[in-house]
Amino acid sequence: VEELCTLYTRQVGRVICLPYGVRAERVYEGIRLYREEPAADMERESIEVTGEMLSRAEKEEVVLALPDGRLHLRIRDFSGNMQEIPKKTYTKWFDYGKIKSGLRLRRRESGDYLKIDAAGHTKKLKEYFVNEKIPAAKRDAIWLLATGSEILWVAGGRIGAGCKVGENTEKILEVRLSGGNDCEDQEN
């Protein structure tokens, strides 16, 4: 009990081992108790969004199967009306003209970063996760839309400034996640 009380005063992420294979971890909400299980390799799925897929997305919605849901892609003309941009958690618009290289939907990797403003300033993805108080145990499960190491979108969170839609945007790439535990098919 004393160890748990001490753990509560420590920084988030600290873990202590208790008898019978039980672990206690300091999390933002308090202390989480769980049984130690063999380390499971976190799925490192990665889905490349090919040029062929993007060509099809100009004509129709392209739907890709994910282990925990679906990825929907669509490219269309943008009217310039900034009020049209959806305010949904799992639907985001990107300036298609600013996307320079291949897109990939993947989990986090070393060296990932977000552009945080139009001036090109960056923030490490890890720093973003810490600032948003996303538990370390959940970070490997979050989908990211990336071009190289630049993160365009942290699914369920912010988009990077590098491909944000602006008044000069001509075409938009609409990306939507659906069907997973955290994303809803029908967003409000």
Residue ranges of model-derived segments:
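AMP-forming adenylation/ATP pyrophosphatase catalytic core
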Residues: V1-N188
